Curated annotation (Swiss-Prot):
Presence of keyword Lyase: no
Name of the protein in question: B3 domain-containing protein At2g32645
Subcellular location: Nucleus
CC per GO annotation: nucleus
Disulfide pairings: none
InterPro entries: At2g31720-like (IPR005508), DNA-bd_pseudobarrel_sf (IPR015300)
GO MF annotation terms: DNA binding
Matches recorded under Pfam families: At2g31720-like (PF03754)
Amino acid sequence: MRNENGYNPKLISTRELFKSDLDKGKARLQVPFNQVKTPDFLTEDETRIIHENAMKIRDDGVPVNLVDPRMNKHALELRKWKMKGNWNYVFVKGWNDVLDANKSNSFKEKDVFPLWSFRSGTGKLCFALTPKIPATALLQENLAVAAMVLLLEVNLVRTKERELVFLYYHKKIHQATTTHNKCKVSWLY
């Protein structure tokens, strides 16, 4: 991002790589709309271009730069496609170059990479696929949440009102183990 004089970084998705993302025959990286954490990363013009491409009104999507985990810059195109009834942002026209440049980095199925958007100094839409999140970091996050749950369970033995509140937040806490969102637990008195 620094090399591009980048600004306005936004976490788009914490993306797990699937077999289809690594398939050079498919030549694309897809990001399902329901996994996008910050949906306002496109300008009005970019949104219009992507929509027109999806409706087959225009041939091209939005040209973007993507910086891979090894700090290589690649020219790609961002589009949106409907696959199996769900909309996805899709990086095409250059995704195979990203795969080739990261062979020694060994992209593997189920590796998790944070995907960020940012603007270059000229305002061009750029993305950064940052180094993968080690499995130990995800494990540590899950252990921290589990410890919080155990601590709450010990403190909940006192009253039924608290137990009801805990049951509600217990569900929310387990959902948070797959994200990086913080849980807020409040008590009813």
